[in-house]
């Protein structure tokens, strides 16, 4: 097998006690994606021969959530990082190299790993850091010539060793030809009673194998997550990076510190996004789209020149050009709006196609419907689409005028240019051009006197 064969082992077996969560630590999300999923994506971008993910705590939940084409290996006992890599040995090539990554180090990037792999060659590669606070981290020990000789975990470190600022990130490149022998010779005679992967550095030095350290260019790239505070810190770093990329690409963000993208955002020119907006899944924004404050948009395509007013929620929907949406509007899955549509405050649309120029400006529910062009919904219109068992469709033609406080009881069809009187409950089809009234006739009672309270 060629010497440049690359295997990747991702360690993801830890419980994450300090997360105080029933969810396995590696499933907590950064940018809307499980941390482990992010690490697998980065690993896959290196085109390795295979990727082995070592799981343990919450194995079934991890496999159910992160559905990837990788080799899943179970570590039944959590006996340390060295033991975890050892469980993956049967799936690693006899030759080549193994890169060790971690499922709770979500921001490691391809550029950093390529630099490490290039520096390591066929020797040992070690990614190091000089963090602001090295507390709790393993220290990099060097000799008088500056060569790395060992990694000492803080619990096993002397006072002098604890004074060292350079720390171990845990990310290693190891030659497969030596890996099995090194792992088999590990001892658990340490403060943790575990098999440390870091002890392989001293073994490499003992065998005359050069250790080539590479310092990570930014600490957050190799930062691990052990608690919710660290998770939140990395989330904000990640979101800041995404905001900066969008700003460089010409998107106006009124407050980059209050912007969240949990997916991918494709955009045209002169897009404006106000504060506190959340974008999830696949988003496409056309030219001159404006998104008001505190909107939540998930898996949506929004056409050019459309304005989304504050506090609107859009999910799994498609919006045409020159639309006016909100404030406080809700577009639910399968809402499909043509061009020049107006959807106002407290209007909800679900599984409905809305034709060009149609308006529903106030307090309206449109569900399971097909609506033509230039139709107007009066305030308080409700499409009653559910009979308690089944959903039914409503068809509304072009240039229909629906009076305020009407109920359209599906299944029902209103032809073109139909008008319905305010307060009507429409239960039968209405032909083109007709006026439909379905309400009780008003009665005025002559001589009626309103009761008064007893003044005594």
Curated annotation (Swiss-Prot):
Ranges for region Pyrophosphorylase: 1-228
Stretches for region Linker: 229-249
Binding site for UDP-N-acetyl-alpha-D-glucosamine: 11-14, 25, 75, 80-81, 102-104, 138, 153, 168, 226, 332, 350, 365, 376
Compartment(s) of residence: Cytoplasm
Residues annotated to bind Mg(2+): 104, 226
Active-site residues from the entry: 362
Assembly notes: Homotrimer.
HAMAP family for this protein: GlmU
Family the entry assigns: In the N-terminal section; belongs to the N-acetylglucosamine-1-phosphate uridyltransferase family. In the C-terminal section; belongs to the transferase hexapeptide repeat family.
Name of the molecule in the record: Bifunctional protein GlmU
UniProt organism field: Neisseria meningitidis serogroup C (strain 053442)
């Amino acid at each position: 097998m060629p010497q440049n064969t690359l295997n990747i082992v991702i360690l993801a077996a830890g419980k994450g006690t300090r997360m105080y969560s029933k969810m396995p630590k590696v499933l907590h999300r950064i940018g809307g994606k499980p941390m482990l999923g992010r690490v697998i994506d980065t690993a896959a971008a290196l085109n390795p021969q295979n990727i082995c993910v070592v799981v343990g705590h919450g194995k079934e939940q991890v496999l159910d959530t992160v559905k990837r084409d990788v080799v899943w290996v179970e570590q039944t006992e959590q006996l340390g990082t060295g033991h975890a890599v050892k469980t993956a040995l049967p799936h690693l090539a006899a030759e080549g190299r193994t890169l060790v990554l971690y499922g709770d180090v979500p921001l490691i990037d391809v550029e950093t790993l390529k630099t490490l792999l290039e520096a390591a060659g066929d020797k040992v590669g070690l990614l190091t850091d000089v963090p602001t606070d090295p507390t709790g981290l393993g220290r990099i020990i060097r000799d008088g010539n500056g060569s790395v000789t060992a990694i000492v975990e803080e619990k096993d470190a002397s006072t002098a060793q604890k004074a060292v600022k350079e720390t171990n990130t845990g990310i290693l490149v190891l030659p497969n030809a030596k890996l099995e022998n090194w792992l088999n010779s590990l001892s658990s005679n340490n403060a943790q009673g575990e098999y440390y992967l870091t002890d392989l550095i001293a073994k490499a030095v003992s065998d005359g194998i050069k250790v080539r350290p590479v310092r990570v260019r930014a600490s957050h790239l190799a930062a691990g997550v052990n608690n919710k505070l660290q998770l939140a810190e990395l989330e904000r770093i990640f979101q800041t990076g995404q905001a900066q990329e969008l700003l460089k690409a010409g998107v106006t963000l009124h407050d980059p510190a209050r912007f969240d993208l949990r997916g991918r955002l494709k955009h045209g020119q002169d897009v404006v996004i106000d504060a506190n907006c959340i974008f999830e899944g696949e988003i496409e924004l056309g030219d001159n789209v404006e998104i008001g404050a505190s909107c939540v948009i998930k898996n949506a395509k929004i056409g050019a020149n459309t304005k989304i007013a504050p506090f609107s929620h859009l999910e799994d929907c498609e919006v045409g050009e020159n639309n006016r949406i909100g404030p406080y509007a809700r577009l639910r899955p399968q809402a499909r709006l043509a061009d020049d549509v107006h959807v106002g405050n407290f209007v909800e649309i679900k599984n409905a196609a809305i034709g060009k120029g149609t308006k529903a400006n106030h307090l309206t529910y449109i569900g399971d419907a097909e609506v033509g062009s230039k139709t107007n919904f009066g305030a308080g219109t409700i499409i009653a689409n559910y009979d308690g068992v089944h959903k039914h469709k409503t068809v509304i033609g072009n240039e229909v005028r629906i009076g305020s406080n009407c109920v359209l009881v599906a299944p029902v069809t209103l032809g073109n240019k139909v008008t319905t009187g305010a307060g009507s409950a429409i239960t039968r089809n209405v032909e083109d051009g007709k006026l439909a009234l379905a309400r009780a006739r008003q009665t005025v009672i002559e001589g009626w006197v309103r009761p008064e309270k007893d003044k005594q």
